[in-house]
Amino acid sequence: MKITNKEVLQSYILTTAKYDYSVYEKRILYRIIEILQFLIEGKKLNEKYSIQITTQNDYDFQIPLSSILVNEKDENYTRIKNAFKSLQKKIIEYEDNKTWLSLNLIERPEITKNGGNSYASFRVSPMIAECFMDFSKGFRKYELKVAMEFESEYSMRFYELLSNKKTPINYSIENLKEIFGLGDKYKLTANFINKVIIPAKKELD
C-alpha cells in the first residue's frame, strides 16, 4: 500500500490518549488505523497487507516492514523490533462515565525475515480495535503521507491534535505534558519548549 495523500480518520479517544510513543511506534499505529479504515469503508487492501478477524473476534494484522520505514534509505529494522516490543508492553486506558478499561495495545508481534519482503504480524484485541474505530466522541482528519514523514513523535502528536481545526485551540503546557505522557520528564518550562515545542514547530512549519 503506497503512501498517498489519503485522509485517515483517527479516533478522538486515541488522539487524546495519554502516551509517549516513539516515531516508529506511531508509524505502526498509523498503519493499524489505515487498515481498519479500509475495513470500515469496505475497500480492498493491497495484497502486501492483510487483516483477519479470528473466531474470538481478535484482529490479526500483517504488514510489510517497508511500510513502517520513512523511505527507501531507512534501514532501521532494530528500531522497528524495539517499537513492536514497546507497543506490546504498553496498555491503553479508556474511561467514560460507565466504563474503565486497561488493555494491551498489541499482542504476539512477530517479524518474518525475507529481505525486502520482510513483514510483521501481530494481534489486536477487539476492544482495542473498537477504541481505534470509535468515532462517537468526534474525530480528527489528517493526511497519512504527512504524518508518516515527521521525524519527531511530538510533531506527529501536534499534527493529530491540530489537523483540520478551523478555529484557534488552546492547550496549557501541563495539559500537553499530560497528553504526551511526559510526567515529570521536563519539569522546567524552558526545557519543555526547547525539547518538544521548538523541534515540532520546525517540522510543522
Give, region by region, the residue ranges found by the protein language model.
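Charged, alpha-helix-forming regions
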Residues: 1-205
